[in-house]
């Protein structure tokens, strides 16, 4: 039976001396995972900007003047072309994100074709499209969608200070519909929104206490974008971010904890501590929707320095070839390792 976490228990973990917390997180990580393996994914923005939501951190909101040029939903073949290049570079999972409050019914046939096309290549599929109805979740599942990303962002108590156009319960409801449809769940949050340590603990309690914890838990560091209300937020202390990764690993021992947005602004040493704390998934060689990710050669060098190996997805078709291709690129410094799906 899964552990039911209390807020006080989560806060106690955050208050644990740093090195003791790291030791506990690493022990748990090694019990459930190979500590040298990191799951790698490619992310593509299939519809950018003009989002009606008011998330204060997001440059894709139509409410803020960030200089982001809005783009319509990409053509199916254009998306599949990007997926082919990602697979050729060794990616095991292809994630597609759209700046919507929710997908329109007129878009569903195109989204289904994207999922089907990527699946036919032997890759895992993931989408993040906003809120879903039960029927939409079922249609995506029928098309073969493996993962659906829908973040909770922060604690229920702090959430209203960040977003007013979508309720916390609506996010939880979407996760429930996704799970009910048989799609794996990807859900996490953001550090650096102005939240307290108690809010970080509250977020992780919400995630860990879902009927089934998410298979993937992305922990993002706020990327401050000029024009958004959070452009001048205080920087996140690297130790506080690493601590959040460690607590997530302890509270959700079987989940993949993803080091996600904000990696561009992290030093190699901070990223290394995140991996030590239990992070075992990244987006690589891509632009995270509208914010930068480390250059491909930087990812290559860091993997080699730390002795980390890419872990392919669980899709049966083509997995061995994908793993071998990426592993070969990791070992060859004169090869372009990572495909930038946002170019």
Swiss-Prot record:
Binding site for [2Fe-2S] cluster: 95, 126, 186, 258
Protein keywords: 2Fe-2S, 4Fe-4S, Biotin biosynthesis, Iron, Iron-sulfur, Metal-binding, S-adenosyl-L-methionine, Transferase
Co-factor requirement: [4Fe-4S] cluster; [2Fe-2S] cluster
Annotated pathway: Cofactor biosynthesis; biotin biosynthesis; biotin from 7,8-diaminononanoate: step 2/2
GO BP terms, alphabetized: biotin biosynthetic process
Pfam families per UniProt: BATS, Radical_SAM
Keyword Lipoprotein carried by entry: no
The protein's name in its UniProt record: Biotin synthase
Source organism: Erwinia tasmaniensis (strain DSM 17950 / CFBP 7177 / CIP 109463 / NCPPB 4357 / Et1/99)
